[in-house]
Amino acid sequence: MQDGLADAQWYRPAVSPERMQVLMARSNGRAAFHTVLWLALLAGSGALAFQSRGRWWAIPAFAAYGALYGGAADPRWHECGHGTAFKSRWANDVVYTVASFMLLREPTMWRWSHVRHHSDTIIVGRDPEISFPRPFKVRVVLANYLHLLNGPAMLRRMVRHAFGSIDDDARDFVPEDDLPRVVWEARIFVAVLAGVIAWSVLIGSIVPLLFIGLPSFYGVWLLWFFAVTQHGGLREDVLDHRLNTRTVYINPVFRFLYLNMNYHLEHHLFPSVPYHHLPQLHAEIKHHLPPPKTSMFAAYREIVLALRRQHKDPTWELPLPVLPADAPAAVLSSKVTRDVEDPEADAVDIGAADMIETGRIVRLDLNGRTYALCRPTADLYALTDGLCTHGQTHLAEGFLDGCTIECPKHNGRFDVRTGEPLRKPVRIPLATYEIERVGGRLMARLDGRRVPPPPALRTTPSR
């Protein structure tokens, strides 16, 4: 791996903070509707498959069931893993866990794997989710459409984890204190699968396995049908998602099955934007991006060309797309920069109380240090360190939902009042500072001590 590629800063186009707050808003209703519709189709196709067993139309019925089980589960797993599909955390976690089982993915291990994928997208030696490692091998890709290589490998790994043997690859990206969770999740998944196998043996029929377990294999073709378009044939070891990720226009049925992940470039640029807002995000930033592929056929034509060439010459690359000549990076947050006379004073005047609107975040740079100033409600202000403790990304570019701030890079969350980590991958608390409104000004303790404004001027404190 080249120096400077791990956990680096990536290109992102400029979008106004006001617009980003709208685009990053989540909805329980829309995600619930799409999830219920998916499960209804899964149940309906499963009932049809069960009723038609032994007849020729069982083949298309089971094909549909498998595609919804082992294929359409993937984007649900993905979006709920980011915590953006539903507004409610518990709903995201439930769907994520169920989809993980359907895909034979151990939840905690794969959550951390995907964090690494977003930190180091298609960086060789760092990204554990590179689908087409070079030199490209045709037989490997064809076998993956039926899970003939990856599936057995994932099951073997799951069994090893169930016995407490964690492989070095998993240890590379899963924190030590999460390894026991990996073991217990593997044990639960193995126990369920073993129970289904025992059920099939007991009744002398493969039917139970056709509904639980085997769909992860015979239905995975749909997963790969969509997934190869994300990064297939594009560049390795670059710090611009426009060079290693593609967007593809597809029809409404495919968009439902794939949960708008065809806007994959937009997703990598702004992973905090939920799937149902990706079309709007695309419209907002498309003038910064390469032209999208106009169909799955166009995408596959490019992918096949690239993979054929890379099979013979691993260094071969597709021609560089024409990119707009804008800045390599852009500040996305409202920003206030100023110097204060004595940052160690009992109370530091950091600015006017009305410099930040309710529900917004402002980047505040004072004397060479950077902070995130938040206003969850009209009477509540909070001041934290500006950089996320996990990815060193500025939190002012993130999403404020009540008293929770979300990192724009990995979707980790903190309570802005206490700095407490609320969602992984963040594990280290965020430094917070006492702040109160005194008249029309904001007074802060930048040394961590409490502000003592005159009682007559005191309003609701931030903590």
Residue ranges: model-predicted function:
Residues A25, E79-F86:
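Transmembrane alpha-helical segments that serve as helix-helix packing and pore/cofactor-lining elements
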Residues S52-P75, V98-T108, S216-V220, Y249-N260, ...:
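Membrane-embedded alpha-helical segments that form the functional core of polytopic membrane enzymes
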Residues A73-H82, W110-I122, F226-G233, L257-V273, ...:
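Histidine-centered catalytic micro-motifs
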Residues A67-W77, E106-W110, M154-M158, F211-L239, ...:
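Transmembrane alpha-helical segments that form the membrane-embedded catalytic/substrate-channel core
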Residues A85-L104, R126-R139, L239-N251:
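Juxtamembrane helix-capping/reentrant segments at transmembrane boundaries
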Residues G402-P408, P421-L430:
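Short cysteine/histidine-rich metal-coordination sites, predominantly Zn2+-binding motifs
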Residues L332-G402, V416, P429-R463:
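N-terminal pre-ligand scaffold of iron-sulfur
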